[in-house]
Amino acid sequence: MSWQNYLDKRLNERRNTPLWRKRQVIQHSNGRYLTTLSGDKYVNFSGNDYLGISQHPDVIQAWQRGANEYGVGSGGSGHITGFTQAHQQLEQQLADWLGYDHALLFSSGYSANQGVIATLLEKEDAIIADKLCHASLMEAAILSPASLWRFLHNSAPSLSQRLHKTSANKSLVVTEGVFSMDGDKAPLAAMAEISQQHQAWLMVDDAHGIGVLGKEGKGSCHEAGIKPELLIATFGKAFGISGAAVLCNKATAEFFEQYSRHLIYSTSMPPAQAVALHAALKVIKQDDEGREYLQQLISFFRQGVSSLPVTLLPSQTAIQPLIIGDELRCQQLSDYLQREGFWVKAIFPPTVPPHSARLRITLTTRHQISDIAMLIELLHGFFNQNR
């Protein structure tokens, strides 16, 4: 089979189905609203900017100051010319904030997850991962020479059984703090205890917990009262920017600096971005009011949709999935909301398990109660018309 025939075959399998992915050009977004290239304006219920920090004037001004001081790029890997005082200060601030020896900056959460697993695991080792872990974690685990075992979602007993069965040299337990498609929290305290009993390390990707959960927004692990050996803090959600950091002890940080290809051979984030992240961290630490308001929005939304004829997952976070199941019906609902001025994107397999197509509704502090009330009214209207 030629390359062209292969590509055509695979594309035709998906074309004209709800599974066909297409990027849409956004002309402007301020968190609450987004405007497409055609000029249409929508209330945005699909973004991850949970605290609205991407629009915060202090953060915007910090990026501008950083660009004026350092330029718009780092110019190289952190091991060559790309590690500036701005990077160093941000790493130290993150480590102090979260109670670790070190923080290492990566260009994205995907890169951080891939880098940790690719660097640490060898053939005699085992990765014990939650079945619903993010694609970045699962891809890294599959590509790793280590054995991969998956435990039932958020099941501490299933994790314990897997660890009992493994005879690996070293074991790494992998989970998310808040799961990106379900919005539920991992039982981190139980998982940490089980991991310690088996001398396994625990790795927590807290992309959707950092900034919005725990004291000062310190995240899922702080809220659960644990300190995993490896904590991934990403900056594309509550921080409102992009990039990530791996929090760990001194020896582990030195190991990554020596052996992590994702760290060594990647151009580091722009120094101006590090300056902006420092400003975002200051906002996050002080924004208890924003976190409290977000919880109020979550409660209001859940109460309003509780009687809908769909499955509302038991999430108490900003991620509120409505499980529709049927892919065509899910797309019809998303299209209906878009016609009414609401941007709520449908999520399909393989991003989520089979037969669990859903609307992944995300709430942010940029929303008003009136926005959510109208969304609730539209959802009820759709199901009343399409019983």
UniProtKB/Swiss-Prot annotation:
- Which Gene Ontology terms cover its molecular function? 8-amino-7-oxononanoate synthase activity; actin binding; pyridoxal phosphate binding
Keyword Transferase attached: yes
**Gene3D superfamilies in the record, alphabetically?**
Aspartate Aminotransferase, domain 1 (3.90.1150.10), Type I PLP-dependent aspartate aminotransferase-like (Major domain) (3.40.640.10)
Q: What does the record give as its pathway? A: Cofactor biosynthesis; biotin biosynthesis
Keywords associated with the record: Biotin biosynthesis, Pyridoxal phosphate, Transferase
Q: Which cofactor does it need?
A: pyridoxal 5'-phosphate
What's a BP term from Gene Ontology annotated to this protein?
biotin biosynthetic process
Q: Which residues bind substrate?
A: R21, H134, T351
Binding-site list for pyridoxal 5'-phosphate: G109, Y110, S180, H208, T234
- Its top-level enzyme class, in one word, is transferase
Domain of life (superkingdom): Bacteria
**What are its E.C. numbers?**
2.3.1.47
Reactions that this protein is recorded to catalyse: 6-carboxyhexanoyl-[ACP] + L-alanine + H(+) = (8S)-8-amino-7-oxononanoate + holo-[ACP] + CO2
| UniProt xrefs under InterPro entries | Aminotrans_II_pyridoxalP_BS, Aminotransferase_I/II_large, AON_synthase_class-II, AONS_Archaea/Proteobacteria, AONS_Proteobacteria, Profilin_CS, PyrdxlP-dep_Trfase, PyrdxlP-dep_Trfase_major
PROSITE patterns given for it?
Answer: AA_TRANSFER_CLASS_2 (PS00599)
- Where N6-(pyridoxal phosphate)lysine occurs along the chain? K237
Q: List the residue ranges forming a coiled coil, or say none.
A: none
Cite the record's note on assembly: Homodimer.
Q: Which NCBIfam families match?
A: bioF
Q: What is the purpose of this protein?
A: Catalyzes the decarboxylative condensation of pimeloyl-[acyl-carrier protein] and L-alanine to produce 8-amino-7-oxononanoate (AON), [acyl-carrier protein], and carbon dioxide.
Membership in a protein family: Belongs to the class-II pyridoxal-phosphate-dependent aminotransferase family. BioF subfamily.
Q: Return the HAMAP family for the record.
A: BioF_aminotrans_2
Can you say what this protein is called? 8-amino-7-oxononanoate synthase
Species: Proteus mirabilis (strain HI4320)
Gene symbol here is bioF
